[in-house]
Amino acid sequence: MMRSFLFSFFLVFQFQSFATIRLPAVIGSNMVLQQKSTVKLWGWGSPGEKVNVATTWHGLIDSTVVDGNGKWIVNLRTPAAGGPYGITIKGSNTIELKNVLIGEVWICSGQSNMEFSYNWGAPAMKKDVAAANIPAIRFFQVQKVTALSPQENLAGEWSVCDTNTVKWFSAVAFYFGKRLNDDLNVPIGLINASWGGTPAETWTPSEIVNRDPALAEASRKLKTSAWWPITPGYTYNAMIAPLTNFSIAGAIWYQGESNTGTASTYSKLFGSMIESWRKAWAKELPFYFVQLAPYTYGEKNIAALLREAQVKTLALHQTGIVVTNDLADDTTDIHPKNKKDVGVRLAKMALANTYSLPISGAYSPLYNYMRVDGDMVTLFFKNVGTGLRAEGRTGEGFFIAGADKQFYPAEARIAGSTITLVSKQVKQPAAVRYAFSNTAVGNIFSREGMPLSPFRTDDWEVDTSSVK
């Protein structure tokens, strides 16, 4: 709390102590501005001071006057992707912004699996890091800080992607941005605002959590830590709110591990968080997120329930989920090292859904409905592409239960886009589960290589007792 107070005090002191034109940290040299859109440039100055903004992409001068609160803002229309450009902002002083690109800008947020970089220990990235001199990709790393109320500025700066800067930046975000750059052939700006260990509550405006009894109660169950905040709104206020004037194309999100203990309210919380961000940006942002990978949690099935909650969030328009139950190299490590496939899958989803490109295997198969005929169950799915396939034994991971709610392993057969199941122990099937546990590794894929999301067809009570 003291750090938050000092940060806020510093910003106020800084803004009031100098009668010069100033910019927020996110507006600077090396930045990427969203193409073919109206973007905002804003800052602070002396009330009544005239501010002129000139850009090298159109050569015109846009003018405004600092208002009575010491703030100014200019709206600029950006052209199609290109650059580098320059921007000159002139008041009582002059600020020159150099090496500015225009392209696609994405915010990347969540907890440690989004924060995870090459320097955290990902030797498989070595070749990609060595080839990462990609000046068309730019990074903005938001420094980790909290605040009691929404802030107007934050700490961070833009940098050019190279073999050094990439080592410290989110691996998932890098691979996401690289695939976008490869396929769209436009500059990509990546803003990383992530913090390991954080629950979704702290990335959500506090009033949204506190005014909902169920969300407020769930937030009180979160485990405190000296290393990351858990208080509703704290990271939203300090790390997201200051960015909401900055035009972006969309958001990617990798989080959920710290909410496994409150999975029953997660879909409501997460959906509310997404809607709050969209309201803040005044845009229905595409929002693509990563499903939890297999991991040995201390309580049974809590990750399965959280994954289920993540899938429920797909009810929101312009959302998408990346399934990762095939990417866990070690289920005792909460940080799977394969970040490349995660980033690429996020990018393929964005390329297909946001940019309308014909991308094969952009979506994972999802359970749709089932049909029972005697002792046989037929499962139907969405997003199956050209069909389904199995790696290894087809029935692995499938379980059937009757009305007694006792689950037994099933024998499975794939027929194009459907799967049929039977079990000698279940004569009248009532429910099916697939990979529905903390550590289950999936082996059913679309023929395009995308893993089937874990699911259950029932809504029965799930055992979440401690693992012994």
Language model: regions and residue ranges:
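Bacterial Sec-dependent N-terminal signal peptides
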Residues: 1-22
